[in-house]
Regions:
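Surface-exposed loop/turn segments flanking beta-strands in extracellular/periplasmic regions
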Residues: 1-7, 56-70, 115-145
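Outer-membrane beta-barrel transmembrane strands
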Residues: 5-53, 73-94, 102, 114-116, ...
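Carboxylate/His-rich catalytic cores and anion/metal-binding grooves
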Residues: 38-40, 90-136
Length: 181
């Protein structure tokens, strides 16, 4: 499609407003100094986006009856994500320096939820009427009004141990399990 660039610059609209904040908190705590350490990590991700656009008939040069003229769009999505990671680290001090052990258990969680709504219409009565909620057409699959939510959750667990004898022989074992919905 070929559009009139002067009319696009003067009459078309395309606005995107996004706001995002990602705070993260981390706590390290020695339950038993240099032997047993707990770490707790949590991160929030809040992302909000608002889109508005309008394609006027004078920019397209197409007849007023086609669905590509006076096309208005308004969309909003709000996404929320919470991730956590909890670790318990065990590093005992042996009397003999020939032995060393590092073991940990870790639990990871994630929760994501998004709420969205959007509407796209065409053939508003005038190029001055740029809001899709006013009377206009929604006759094909592109032109629609939809809303909904999505949510996913996951959890993972790790159990790991590494034993060393004389810094020469290493034995490592790890088990991991995951689940989601």
């Amino acid at each position: 499609r070929i559009y009139n660039p002067v009319a696009m610059a003067a009459k078309a609209k395309y606005n995107v407003l996004g706001e995002r904040i990602v705070p993260r908190f981390l706590v390290d705590y020695f339950i038993v100094r240099n032997v047993l350490k707990a770490t707790f990590d949590i991160q929030f991700d809040i992302n909000n986006t608002k889109n508005k656009s309008f394609l006027p008939q004078i920019a397209t040069g197409r007849p007023n009856t086609e669905t590509v003229v006076n096309r208005a769009y308004d969309g909003d999505i709000d996404a929320f994500n919470v991730s956590t990671q909890s670790t318990l680290l065990y590093t005992p001090n042996f009397k003999s320096e020939k032995h060393s052990l590092v073991a940990f258990v870790k639990v990871l969680t994630n929760d994501y939820k998004a709420v969205f709504q959007e509407i796209m219409t065409s053939n508003t009565a005038s190029s001055l009427l740029i809001d899709p909620s006013i009377p206009s057409r929604t006759q094909n699959s592109e032109l629609r009004a939809v809303s909904g939510t999505t949510q996913t959750r996951s959890i993972g667990g790790i159990l790991s141990a590494q034993y060393s004898f004389k810094d020469k022989y290493l034995f490592n074992a790890m088990v991991r399990g995951d689940g989601n919905s």
